[in-house]
Structures are given as structure tokens and as C-alpha cells.
Amino acid sequence: MNTQALLRWLPAALAWAAAGTVCAQGVLVPPAPPAPPQDTLTRAATSVGIKRCLPAISRLSSLTVQGSRSHDVLLDWDRKRPDAGPMFSLIGMQYPNAGVAASITAIPDESGACTVSAERISVAPFTCESVAQQELASYKMTRLLPNYAVYTDAKEPTSSVSLIDSPPGCLIIRRYVEYGWKDPAAVSAAPPPGKR
């Protein structure tokens, strides 16, 4: 075999050898175990025996802590009936330039559904009027007190944003409530009525 032929086949041989090494490593090294849930609330709720509302709690919690540097949770639950009683949580989050708090509540009902609510509480270093103009221009405003206004959007009837003047800034409370929430995965896995 001449030198030119060797040089033509050398890259292919090296690639084949590297691929074999990678495949062999995949066979010899067991796959990593699945990562634990990333948010503290999901881990805490799981550890105390909450199951029925866990998918809703996990969904809300993962959205709530997204982008935070760190977070921790204070959890209250019915210790006699952890999976059948209400769960209340307060989450503290650290962001690069601010601290934020959130509250997530889940209450199971007899039908297997859950009532869930989430509130995210933060402070903006701006006036509430400027926050409303920038973020809530299309929302309907209802003034509850001279320093307290609630904004709603007809497209999201179970959500609201409250702005409370707190000079020199604005206290912002974003709220979401859903009644009769059912896990979409459990609903789609259930057999149709009458076909059991």
C-alpha cells in the first residue's frame, strides 16, 4: 500500500477507532441515574408523602424557581393525611440583583382533582405606574385602594397582577389559581368511561 492510499484511509480508520471506543465506553459504563427533581418544593412534597397534587406542585414550582441562583422552601402540610390534606409553601429565591418570594398551595378534593394557587412576590425599583405602562398596558385595572391596583387579562381569567405603591418602589404580586386541576398525564392514561 502506498503512502497516498494510507493518508486517504487514515482519517476514516481513526474515526472508526474513536467510534468504537465511544461505543465500548457506553457499554462498559452504566447509564447515570435520573437526576432528582431540581426544585426544592417538589423534593420536600415528595418526602412527606404528597402524591395526588404533586404534578401540579412540581409544574408550578419549576416555573417559579426558573432562573434563580438558589432557592429554599418552608412547607406546611396535614401530617395525619399528607396526600389528602392541603399543602402550603413559601419559597424564597435569590436572583443576581433581587430576592423574590413565592407561595404555592395545593388542596386535593374527593374527585382526585386539586385546587392550586401560586403567588410570586417581588419588588421593582420603579413606580407602579411605570410597571403598569411597561408590562400591563392591555390589562384591565381595578383600583382597590389609593396605593393598590389589581390588573387582569380576559385571556387569563384565573390570573391577576397586583401592584402596591411602596416608595421608592413597587410591590408586585402575580397570582394564579386553578380549581379542579387534574394531571393531564393521568387523564389521558385513564380508560374511556364504559370501556373497562
Which sequence ranges carry the predicted segments?
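Short, structured motif recognition centered on aromatic/hydrophobic residues
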Residues: 50-57, 116-118, 128, 168-175
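Short, exposed beta-strand-loop hairpins at the edges of beta-sheets
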Residues: 151-154, 160-169, 174
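Short, low-complexity, Pro/Ser/Thr/Gly-rich segments in the mature regions of secreted, periplasmic
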Residues: 171-196
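Bacterial N-terminal signal peptides that target proteins for export
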Residues: 2-13
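Long, charged/polar, surface-exposed segments that mediate recognition or autoinhibition
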Residues: 95-149
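Boundary at the C-terminal end of the N-terminal hydrophobic targeting segment
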Residues: 22-26
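N-terminal secretory signal peptides
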Residues: 27-110, 176-184
